[in-house]
Swiss-Prot record:
UniProt xrefs under InterPro entries: Dicty_CAD (IPR008601)
Compartments reported by the entry: Cell surface
Similarity remark: Belongs to the csb family.
Lineage: Eukaryota, Amoebozoa, Evosea, Eumycetozoa, Dictyostelia
Major localization class: other
GO biological process, one term: culmination involved in sorocarp development
Species annotation: Dictyostelium discoideum
Transmembrane segments: none
Keywords, comma-separated and alphabetical: Cell adhesion, Glycoprotein
Descriptive protein name: Glycoprotein 24B
One annotated Gene Ontology cellular component of this protein: extracellular matrix
Amino acid sequence: MTDLKITLVNEDGESTISGKGHPLPAPLIFPPIYCFCFIQYKTEGKLWDKNDFQIKSGKIEFGGEEYDITESKGTWSKDDEENHIKVSLHLIVPPKKIFQKNF
């Protein structure tokens, strides 16, 4: 696990999730799907009140690099027993720089 921060912008404003996390395996399709798992995390913003959401823009901060998030649909789910949260972003518009940390 490493430091990971995702900032998402939608009609409710800016929301973030940050903490220890890592990318999860995702299908190799285009535009890409980004999947992440967080432990020891903190959320801010109204987006986390809904399990499904639309994103206008955003960014991923991982490993000292930043990656833009384009228009996308997202979901999140929380596992209270395991104390982690999973976030999936299904990009609608291809980004200029693809986050290629999925493994």
